[in-house]
A protein has these predicted regions:
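Conserved beta-strand-loop surface patch within small alpha/beta domains used
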Residues: 1-86, 94-178
Length: 178
């Protein structure tokens, strides 16, 4: 899990992902990239459920889909039931850059109070892709990976990131069903 081979970011996967994220604008869109057969990747569009939580308990969940995302935990369970590995967790930043925000980091880590190592990735081995959507159109994307040595999320540099950026900006739009 977490390996981002260039061939796996197919034009079809990128087109479906970008269309879903653009359609979510001006809210944050989200989804999962899953490995389906040991080789191929597919995009699974997910509803951003943060507004439901905010409506029920605004004190505990003060943010809304305009500036935060929450994937229904059942999406992860469904992927596991289908025998799929979640390799990338995707979300967009409406009218903002493709950075991994403090809120993104907090949501991606599982605190372990009193443990020798106080943080652990919530989904070990999964990378995070943040896509900047400005005025409803995908502009750029950056991939982030948990570094075991630094115990922090680091931006993935190199060919994978370049392929993604080029793929996002050159993607032909297609229809996608939820």
């Amino acid at each position: 899990m977490g390996e981002t081979g260039d061939a796996r970011w197919s034009p079809e996967l990128l087109a479906k992902m970008v269309q879903w994220l653009e359609d979510a604008y001006p809210c944050e869109g989200c989804g999962l990239v899953v490995e389906t057969d040991g080789e191929g990747w597919e995009f699974r569009a997910c509803d951003n459920v943060i507004d439901k939580y905010h409506e029920l308990d605004p004190e505990t969940y003060p943010r809304t889909s305009r500036d935060f995302y929450m994937i229904d935990p059942r999406a992860f369970m469904k992927a596991e039931d289908r025998g799929e590995d979640v390799v990338v967790i995707v979300h967009s930043h409406p009218d903002a850059g493709d950075y991994f925000s403090d809120a993104d980091v907090e949501a991606a880590l599982m605190p372990r109070p009193g443990a020798e190592d106080p943080v652990e990735p919530l989904y070990p081995g999964s990378d995070y892709l943040v896509v900047s959507i400005r005025d409803g159109k995908a502009q750029s994307a950056s991939l982030y990976r948990f570094d075991e040595a630094t115990r922090e999320f680091e931006k993935v540099e190199g060919l994978d990131a370049q392929v993604l950026r080029e793929g996002i900006s050159d993607t032909e739009r297609c229809e996608v069903s939820a």
